[in-house]
C-alpha cells in the first residue's frame, strides 16, 4: 500500500475482521413475481432508442395496428357487443355447444360427456374441439353469453395478423418482413376464393371459428418453435401453444404436426434433436386428454363421404393451388418462389422451412384425396388454407429480398442502419398502400370511387379530374367482397331477423308441448322438415337450437356435429322421407323424399315423439297418416305426435349376432344398419354386433343384385345392402312391461316387470355407456343399444373408459414434464445455427436479435448487433446485419474517425465474441433463472 494510503481508509478496516454478516432475507414471492412482470417492459423502455429502432417500431405499430384495426372494422364491434344470439350458417347452431358445456358438463366436473340434444345422443366434445368452447364459458363469467360467444368467435381472425408478425419476429426475419407478414395474414383473411375450408373471414362466419383460433395458436407456436430451435429457450411455452392449437381444431392438428416436424428436421443437430423431441413429447401429452380419445373412438363417428377435389371436368389441382386471378397468382407465387430460393441460398432456415412446408402441403392435398388412411374423415381441400397463408407470408420474404438485392446492386458501400431502416419502412408502407387500395376496391369502399358504365359494362372506377386511373368490372356473380356483410348478418343475431317473431312463437309452442301434463305429450325428440325457408330465421339450422331454448326438453333430431354420432345417417334418411325436398348431406345413402308411409315407421324406430312440417306437400302426407296426430300449429308449421315411438321398448324376438366382416368397420356397420333400417321386413330379428352366447350367430353378404357402384366415392355409388346368408331362427320372447322411465343428461333408468328379456334402448351406441342391473349394453342396428336385465331396476350411465383415464393421465404427465423441463433449464445449443462451424463459447451471448434488448448485444468489435437487417452469407439466418447508427454509440465501443462516419460494419454472427458474459442484475440472481443449463 502506498505511504499514507491507510490514512484514507475507514477506521473500521484497521480493526480485526468480524464475523460474516448474515445473508439478507430473500424477497417474498409476490415481490419476485412483481419484478418479473415489470422487468421486460422496463428493460424495453430503458434500452437506447436509435433512429433505426424508432423507425422499426413505428412501422410495426402502423402496419400491425392497421391490420388489427381493419379486422375490428370488418367484425362490426358495435354488433359484437350487442346482447343478442349470433346466427348465420353453422354459427347459429354452435350457440348450443358452449352453453351445454357450461350448464351440464362443467357443473359435473367434466369438459367432455354425453348429450341427448341431437341425433339420439352423442358424445359431447369428444370429437369436437373443446378449447374454444371453454374460452366462451370463461368469458361468459363477465359478459352476457351472446357477447362472449361473438368475442371468442372473432378472436382468431382479429389476432392472426399479430400472430403472423410475432412469427416473423420470433423467427428473426429481417425488418420489415415481420411487419409485412401481418399484411400477409390480412390478405389471407380477406381471400374469398373459399368459404368453408377454414381460417379466412367467410369460413369463420360460416361457423369455422375454432379453426381460425387454432390457426392463430399454430402460427404463434411455430414462431416459438423457431426461436427455441435457435436458442434452446421457450420449450414449455412452445409445447403449451402448439397443444392449444391441436386442441382447438383437428384439421389444424394435422398442420401443426406436419409443419413442426419439418421445422425440426430443417434445424436438426444433436441438441436440437433433444429440444424438438422433449418439446414434442410434452405437447402431445398435454393434448392427449382430447386427441387420444378421438383417435381411439373414431370408428363410432359418421363419415359424411364428402368426396375430394378435384371434382368434375372444370376442377383441377392447378385451380386448387392457384385460387386467385391469374395476375395475382403470378405476383404472389412469383415473389414466394423468390423468397424460398433466396432463403435456401442464404441458409435462412425458417424461410426455407416455409417453402418446404408449402410443397409438403401440396403433396398432402394430393395424397389425401381419398381421405386419411385408417381414420378417413378428411376432405382434402381443408389443407389448402395453410398453403395459402404460408405462400402469402413467403411472398413478403421475396419482396424484401428483392428490394435488398436491388439496393446492393446500385450501391457501392454497405448501407447504414438508418438507411436500411428507411428503405425497410418505405417498402413496408408501399406494400401496405398497394394492399389497402386493392382491398378498398375489393370491398367497394375506395374513397372517391364511383359506379359507372364503360363500353356497355358496369364498372367501379377511381380517378382524378375525370380520368379513371383504376377501373374494375362490376358485373358477374360476385360484385364486391362480402366479409363485412357476412359478419354484420351473423352478429345482428336471431333477434335481428325479420322473422324472429315467427321463430320465437314456434319455439314457445314446442316448449308448451314439452310442459304439457298429458302423458302422451311432454318432453321428447322432434324431427323438423328440412326446407330453405328456415333461413329466414337467421340460418337453415335455426331449429337445431330447440333443446337450447327449451332446456333440453325438446331434443332436435338434427344437430350440427354431423360426424360425432353414428346415428346421423339414419336421421337424414328419416328426414328425407318427411320433407318435400331434403338436403341429404350424407352421400351414398338411398334416400326417399316426401313419403310419410316410409318416414313414419322410421320415426317410430328412432323414438321420435314430434314431427314438424312446413310445406304443403309434407303436410298433406302427414295428414294422410293414422299414426300421426296433429297436436299444435304455429305460423306455417304443423306439429304432429308420432304414435308408438317410445325410447325404451322390450323386444319380442331375440336378436341375432352378425359375424364381423373385413374392411372399413365404419362402412360395415353402416351397411348393416341401413339394410335393417330401410328393409326391416327382410330381417326376422334385430341384428347385433355382439350378445350373449344363446343369441344366434349369422353371416351376412352383399346383395349383388342391388349393388350400385363399387369404388368408394365413385359418382352415383350407393351403400351396399346386406342380407342374412342363412335363415334366422325366430326365438319369440315373453312380453314384459317397461315402467318408471327416466332420462337424465348422462343417465337412463327404467324398471322391467321380468328379468332376462332383452330391452331396446333407442339411444346412440357408444362404448362409454355402462349398465347396472343388466348385461350389456350391446350394439344393435341401426346404432342403438340392447341390455338384458338381471334386475327389475336398470340404471345406465355414461362414464370415462379406461383408455380415457389413461389419456387424462398422459396429460398430467405432460404437466409434470413441463415442471421437469423448467427445473432442468433451457437446452444449450453448441451454435446459434446448425450449419455454423465455430462453436459458441460460454462467454458468447447466443441471443443477438432485437427481440431481447437493443443495447445488450454486440459483435466482436463492440458494435451493437441488430438482427433486423440484411447481412451477407455465409449463414444468413433471416437476414442479419450489424448496423452502426450515428445516434447511438456504446461507451464500451470506441469509434475512430473512419467508423464515426455513417458506415456500417457487418458482423459475422458466428465469430466468437470477446465481450464479457451478460451481467446478472440482483433481480435476476434472486429469481434463479440463469443457472447453467443442462443438455436437456
Label for each model-derived stretch:
Residues 2, 6-494, 505, 512-517, ...:
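Membrane-embedded transmembrane-helix bundle of lipid-linked glycan/lipid transferases
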Residues 49, 702-854, 935:
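Active-site-proximal, structured, solvent-exposed surfaces of multi-pass membrane proteins
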Residues 190, 250, 532-536, 611, ...:
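Solvent-exposed loop/turn segments at secondary-structure junctions
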Residues 242, 434-497, 501, 511-602, ...:
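Extracytoplasmic/lumenal acceptor-recognition loop(s) of multi-pass membrane glycoenzymes
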Residues 255-256, 294, 535-538, 618-623, ...:
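Extracytoplasmic/secreted cell-surface and envelope-processing proteins
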Residues 256, 527-529, 614, 643:
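Generic beta-strand/beta-sheet core signal
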Residues 618-645:
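Short acidic, glycine/proline-enriched helix-loop-strand junctions
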Residues 905-907, 911-936:
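Intrinsically disordered, compositionally biased tail regions
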Amino acid at each position: 500500500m502506498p505511504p499514507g494510503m491507510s490514512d484514507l481508509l475507514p477506521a473500521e478496516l484497521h480493526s480485526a475482521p468480524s464475523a460474516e454478516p448474515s445473508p439478507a432475507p430473500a424477497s417474498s414471492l409476490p415481490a419476485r413475481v412483481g419484478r418479473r412482470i415489470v422487468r421486460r417492459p422496463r428493460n424495453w423502455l430503458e434500452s437506447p432508442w436509435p433512429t433505426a429502432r424508432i423507425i422499426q417500431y413505428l412501422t410495426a405499430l402502423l402496419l400491425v395496428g392497421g391490420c388489427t384495426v381493419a379486422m375490428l372494422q370488418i367484425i362490426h364491434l358495435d354488433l359484437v357487443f350487442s346482447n343478442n344470439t349470433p346466427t348465420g350458417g353453422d354459427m347459429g347452431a354452435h350457440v348450443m355447444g358452449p352453453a351445454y358445456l357450461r350448464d351440464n358438463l362443467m357443473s359435473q366436473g367434466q369438459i367432455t360427456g354425453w348429450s341427448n340434444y341431437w341425433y339420439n345422443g352423442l358424445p359431447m366434445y369428444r370429437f369436437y374441439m373443446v378449447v374454444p368452447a371453454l374460452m366462451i364459458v370463461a368469458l361468459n363469467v363477465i359478459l352476457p353469453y351472446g357477447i362472449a360467444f361473438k368475442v371468442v368467435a372473432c378472436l382468431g381472425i382479429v389476432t392472426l395478423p399479430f400472430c403472423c408478425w410475432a412469427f416473423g419476429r420470433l423467427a428473426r426475419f429481417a425488418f420489415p418482413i415481420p411487419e409485412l407478414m401481418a399484411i400477409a395474414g390480412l390478405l389471407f383473411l380477406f381471400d374469398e376464393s373459399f368459404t368453408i375450408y377454414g381460417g379466412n373471414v367467410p369460413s369463420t362466419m360460416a361457423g369455422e371459428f375454432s379453426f381460425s383460433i387454432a390457426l392463430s395458436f399454430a402460427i404463434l407456436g411455430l414462431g416459438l418453435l423457431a426461436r427455441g430451435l435457435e436458442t434452446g429457450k421457450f420449450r414449455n411455452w412452445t409445447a403449451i401453444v402448439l397443444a392449444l392449437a391441436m386442441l382447438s381444431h383437428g384439421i389444424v392438428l394435422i398442420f401443426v404436426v406436419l409443419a413442426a416436424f419439418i421445422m425440426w428436421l430443417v434445424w436438426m443437430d444433436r441438441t436440437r434433436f433433444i429440444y424438438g423431441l422433449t418439446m414434442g413429447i410434452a405437447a402431445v401429452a398435454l393434448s392427449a386428454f382430447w386427441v387420444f380419445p378421438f383417435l381411439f373412438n373414431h370408428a363410432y363417428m359418421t363419415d359424411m363421404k364428402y368426396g375430394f377435389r378435384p371434382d368434375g371436368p372444370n376442377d383441377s389441382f392447378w385451380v386448387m393451388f392457384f385460387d386467385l386471378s391469374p395476375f395475382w397468382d403470378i405476383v404472389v407465387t412469383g415473389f414466394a418462389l423468390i423468397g424460398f430460393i433466396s432463403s435456401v441460398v442464404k441458409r435462412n432456415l425458417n424461410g426455407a422451412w416455409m417453402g418446404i412446408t408449402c410443397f409438403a402441403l401440396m403433396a398432402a392435398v394430393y395424397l389425401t384425396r381419398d381421405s386419411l388412411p385408417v381414420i378417413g374423415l378428411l376432405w382434402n381441400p381443408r389443407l389448402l388454407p395453410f398453403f395459402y397463408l404460408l405462400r402469402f407470408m413467403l411472398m413478403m420474404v421475396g419482396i424484401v429480398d428483392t428490394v435488398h438485392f436491388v439496393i446492393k446492386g446500385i450501391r457501392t458501400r454497405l448501407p447504414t442502419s438508418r438507411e436500411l431502416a428507411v428503405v425497410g419502412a418505405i417498402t413496408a408502407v408501399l406494400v401496405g398502400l398497394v394492399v389497402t387500395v386493392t382491398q378498398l376496391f375489393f370491398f367497394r369502399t375506395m374513397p372517391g370511387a364511383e359506379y359507372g358504365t364503360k363500353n356497355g359494362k358496369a364498372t367501379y372506377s377511381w380517378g382524378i379530374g375525370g380520368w379513371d386511373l383504376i377501373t374494375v368490372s362490376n358485373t358477374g356473380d360476385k360484385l364486391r367482397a362480402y366479409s363485412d356483410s357476412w359478419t354484420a348478418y351473423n352478429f345482428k343475431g336471431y333477434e335481428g331477423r325479420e322473422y324472429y317473431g315467427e321463430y320465437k312463437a314456434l319455439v314457445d309452442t314446442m316448449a308448451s308441448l314439452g310442459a304439457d301434463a298429458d302423458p302422451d305429450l311432454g318432453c321428447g325428440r322432434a324431427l323438423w322438415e328440412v326446407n330453405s325457408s328456415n333461413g329466414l330465421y337467421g340460418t337453415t339450422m335455426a331449429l337445431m337450437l330447440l333443446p337450447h331454448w327449451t332446456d333440453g326438453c325438446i331434443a332436435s333430431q338434427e344437430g350440427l356435429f354431423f360426424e360425432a354420432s353414428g346415428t346421423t345417417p339414419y336421421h337424414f334418411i328419416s328426414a328425407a322421407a318427411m320433407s318435400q325436398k331434403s338436403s341429404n348431406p350424407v352421400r351414398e345413402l338411398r334416400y326417399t323424399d316426401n313419403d310419410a308411409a316410409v318416414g313414419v315407421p322410421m320415426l317410430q324406430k328412432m323414438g321420435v315423439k314430434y314431427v314438424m312440417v312446413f310445406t304443403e306437400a309434407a303436410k298433406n302426407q302427414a295428414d294422410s297418416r293414422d299414426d300421426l296426430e296433429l297436436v299444435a300449429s304455429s305460423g306455417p308449421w304443423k306439429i304432429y305426435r308420432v304414435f308408438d315411438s317410445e325410447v325404451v321398448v322390450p323386444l319380442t324376438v331375440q336378436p341375432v349376432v352378425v359375424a364381423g366382416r373385413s374392411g372399413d368397420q365404419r362402412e360395415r356397420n353402416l351397411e348393416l344398419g341401413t339394410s335393417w333400417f330401410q328393409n326391416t321386413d327382410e330381417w326376422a330379428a334385430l341384428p347385433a354386433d355382439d350378445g350373449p352366447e344363446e343369441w344366434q350367430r349369422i353371416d351376412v353378404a352383399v346383395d349383388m343384385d342391388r349393388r350400385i357402384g363399387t369404388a368408394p366415392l365413385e359418382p352415383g355409388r350407393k351403400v351396399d345392402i346386406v342380407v342374412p346368408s342363412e335363415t334366422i331362427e325366430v326365438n319369440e320372447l315373453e312380453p314384459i312391461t317397461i315402467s318408471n322411465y327416466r332420462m337424465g343428461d348422462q343417465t337412463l333408468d327404467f324398471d322391467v316387470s321380468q328379468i332376462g328379456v332383452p330391452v331396446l334402448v333407442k339411444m346412440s351406441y357408444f362404448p362409454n355407456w355402462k349398465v347396472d342391473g343388466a348385461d350389456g349394453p350391446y350394439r344393435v342396428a341401426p346404432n342403438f343399444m340392447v341390455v338384458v336385465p338381471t334386475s327389475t331396476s336398470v340404471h345406465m350411465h355414461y362414464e370415462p373408459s379406461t383408455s380415457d383415464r389413461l389419456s387424462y393421465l398422459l396429460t398430467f404427465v405432460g404437466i409434470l414434464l413441463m415442471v421437469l423441463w423448467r427445473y432442468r433449464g433451457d437446452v444449450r445449443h453448441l451454435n446459434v445455427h446448425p450449419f455454423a462451424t465455430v462453436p459458441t463459447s460460454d462467454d458468447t451471448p447466443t441471443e443477438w436479435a432485437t427481440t431481447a434488448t437493443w443495447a445488450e448485444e454486440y459483435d466482436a468489435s463492440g458494435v451493437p448487433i441488430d438482427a433486423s437487417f440484411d447481412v451477407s452469407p455465409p449463414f444468413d439466418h433471416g437476414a442479419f446485419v450489424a448496423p452502426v447508427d450515428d445516434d447511438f454509440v456504446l461507451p464500451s465501443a470506441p469509434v475512430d474517425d473512419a467508423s464515426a462516419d455513417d458506415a456500417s460494419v457487418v458482423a459475422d454472427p458466428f465469430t466468437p465474441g470477446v465481450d464479457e458474459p451478460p451481467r446478472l442484475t440482483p433481480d435476476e440472481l434472486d429469481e434463479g433463472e440463469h443457472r447453467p443449463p443442462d443438455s436437456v
